[in-house]
């Protein structure tokens, strides 16, 4: 089921993203698909979507053409990042082109066609997300703020041979 205005806070946040021009229709549509897959809108989900889309641009790859090693571990809420990556990058557990490793950090390494990019969320961003109750009225508002930031505000990254 696609989120709509009837879906409460998530629907309202998605409508606000569209109205605010949160980075273009690819981002908006991918976030909508990620919410459908994951079950709700949250900031780590959006951060994962942003990582996957960034990796696709950096590696000039279509969904499913990359491999990803994600270092979140399997403990929510940080692991919600995985669902965003699966939807945006097409790296899925079913395809076997994604793996999850400790140590519980917001970092993913993507590789394709002999190239690699490692993307890590800024510590300040992760801290802000983890303390969202102190800063935002809702989880959806926190996700909306993440969707509007530039890659440079969210991530550090390193390119290299794959």
Model regions and ranges:
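Non-transmembrane, aqueous-exposed alpha-helical and coiled segments at domain scale
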Residues: 2-162
């Amino acid at each position: 089921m696609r989120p709509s205005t009837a879906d409460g806070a998530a629907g309202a946040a998605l409508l606000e993203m569209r109205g605010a021009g949160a980075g273009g229709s690819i981002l908006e549509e991918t976030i909508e698909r990620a919410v459908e897959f994951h079950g709700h809108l949250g900031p780590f989900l959006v951060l994962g979507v942003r990582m996957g889309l960034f990796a696709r641009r950096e590696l000039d790859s279509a969904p499913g053409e990359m491999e990803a090693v994600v270092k979140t571990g399997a403990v929510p809420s940080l692991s919600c990042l995985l669902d965003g990556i699966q939807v945006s990058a097409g790296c899925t557990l079913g395809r076997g082109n994604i793996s999850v490793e400790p140590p519980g950090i917001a970092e993913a390494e993507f590789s394709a066609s002999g190239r690699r990019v490692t993307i890590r969320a800024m510590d300040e961003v992760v801290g802000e997300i983890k303390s969202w109750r102190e800063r935002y009225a809702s989880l959806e508002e926190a996700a909306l703020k993440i969707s509007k930031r530039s890659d440079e505000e969210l991530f550090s990254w390193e390119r290299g041979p794959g």
